[in-house]
Design a protein with these regions (language model features):
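Gly-rich Lys/Arg/Thr-decorated short loops/hinges at beta-loop-alpha junctions or inter-strand turns
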Residues: 2-3
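Active-site-proximal helix/loop segments of hydrolytic enzymes
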Residues: 6-219
Length: 219
């Protein structure tokens, strides 16, 4: 699955290169990084989330550069899971075969759907503000580095890959291949390096702030 394609540029190759560079920056900042893929392979959505749980991740980031023909989408955008999608996600993710992967390894076998839903809601009460804080840190960092940003740089959507209840999760659209401006930027190694550095710095800042605020969120 090559993802989006435009003028010979494929999303899968572009984002893999971007992710590998971001990993190197983060490692230099003393941050442990686990990649869902580090080569040209396809990883199912549910397996990406499972990798994050197995690694006991503190932040899950999904990188994209899509093609949207309608609306003239352009500029970097960071998504968190929407309230509407969260309700739907709870309904589907509370299914028995997924429960052990959803709530920090907790075994919900024998729990009814109502109990599972309550546990998911409790997990999201802690995770949602942390995801939003990560989105704010990322958009601020990318904007300060020159962006360019979408008119509404923080949005909510029901992306399946963001449905983990217990790990702060964001999806970053670095830009849109359907935008001539974004495509030009995404092809530019200097621009990509600037954005990689900005995102890495933003993650490091979020990590430090999150460590201080997490105990307060749990109260």
């Amino acid at each position: 699955d090559p993802g989006a394609e435009r003028d010979g540029v494929t999303e899968k190759d572009l984002m893999l290169s971007f992710a590998l560079s971001l990993r190197d920056f983060l490692v230099r900042d003393g941050i442990d990084v686990v990649m869902t893929r580090d080569s040209d392979v396809f990883v199912a959505l549910e397996n990406r989330v499972a990798f994050a749980h197995q690694a006991e991740g503190n932040l899950f980031i999904s990188l994209h550069a899509d093609v949207l023909q309608q609306g003239g989408a352009k500029g970097a955008t960071v998504y968190t899971l929407s309230d509407e999608a969260s309700d739907t996600a709870t309904e589907h993710l509370a299914a028995r075969h997924n429960r052990s992967d959803i709530i920090a390894g907790a075994d919900l076998t024998g729990s009814d759907d109502q109990v599972a839903g309550i546990l998911l809601d409790l997990a999201r009460q802690e995770t949602e503000p942390r995801s939003v804080a990560a989105a704010k840190a990322l958009t601020a960092g990318m904007k300060a580095a020159g962006g360019p940003m979408n008119r509404h740089p923080i949005r909510n959507a029901g992306f399946s890959v963001l449905k983990s209840a217990d790990i702060p999760s964001v999806l970053i659209e670095i830009g849109f291949l359907s935008s001539e401006r974004d495509l030009s930027n995404l092809r530019d190694p200097i621009w990509r390096a600037v954005m990689v550095s900005a995102i890495a710095d933003s993650i490091a800042k979020w990590r430090d702030t999150d460590a201080a605020l997490k105990p307060l969120i749990r109260q």
